[in-house]
Amino acid sequence: MNNLKKKKNPSARELAVTVICTVTQQGKSLTEALTLADVLEPRDKAFCREICYGTIRWYSRLEGLLNLLLKKPFKAKDSDIKVLILTGLYQIIYLSTPDHAAVSETVSTCSAGRKSWAKGVLNGVLRNFLRNRATLEKSIDAQLNQQFSHPTWLIQQLQKDWGDQLSHILQANNQHPPMSIRVNEKAISRHQYVKQLDEAAIKTHENPFNSVGLTLDQAVNVDQLPGFWQGTCSVQDSAAQLAASLMKVEDNQRILDVCAAPGGKTAHLLESTNDSNALTAIDIDELRNQRVIENLTRLNLKADVLTVDALETAEWFDQQPFQRILLDAPCSATGVIRRHPDIKLLRQASDIKALVELQSQLLEAIWPLLEKGGRLLYATCSILSAENSQQIANFVSRHTDAQPVTIDAQWGQACEFGRQILPGQDNMDGFFYACLTKT
């Protein structure tokens, strides 16, 4: 229970504790929980976000250090005090704040609530850490799961799937991701937009794998992007920008985007094709589908957006086959941990089996909707082979009319079926793509 937030105008750190407790105790996503910080002024909100993302990113390591510093664990009702200490440890270890200031700020936060009794505990624990920091960190880093702050089950699975690339993956997952954008080529060329960005003092470099992607040297608010609200560009990781070209859409084709929300790939498909194509975007979540509609409206694009269950094709399929299908399958999201560090806390090993089964069901349901000679692109933001190459291998073994298409590319690495990008490769998120044609 969080008793720290007792003032009408809580501080950034008080709200950070509330946000983190919302994730760790209620199981809400960090993105959702961070809406609590919208009441803060921009500068305080930025600090709150940094504390939240950083503490969640390094939660297991920080918790391990705290356990070494405590004689006995905190009671459940005092979990907010535990989290407050973790934020202090994060600030000391990973931010440039002077040690004495980090300790003082953390302890003073305790005075804001009903648990002023804990001030002495906080002060003692943090100062004890400062005295014994080298020894404590050496001890905790002897264990891989705490050194890199990843759950043991995930480390074991990544070791099995990727072997000697494990260390690279774990390190990449803890890096701050870049901000990438996709220029809407129906509105402006990348070359022209770069000029506008230069005039706005926003420095970028071009995505080498397509003609519309840019990565910003430093993240900015979308309000600072020239013409953003008029549809000049969208925020989208470089890996997700690869889908449109892999679809190889031709004129006068019917396109189906399955699990389309929030619509980034939907919009890119429409931006990169002409108006002779008809695109249907489906998703089971009505609220998320509203995001699709909002994005398409901002970009001045049109599609048939349906809130339906992709598995129940009899309820929405009009019996007119599609020439192109994109299945952006629900997955473990293990490729985007650097953007969503709460995945390390919220995702469980038991989730993977259920996700693999759902992906298989979606493939089985959607495959009959593809016209003979048509192309299906299977995509995930996972780096687990069970959801990716093995999933496609199993599907192909069951369907003699499914022909794998080799993806000839300069990005990622080839798998038996499909192509995998690991986190951080070419500054991209972890992503998997596999192409199938129907014979």
Segment roles from a protein language model:
Residues 1-439:
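S-adenosylmethionine
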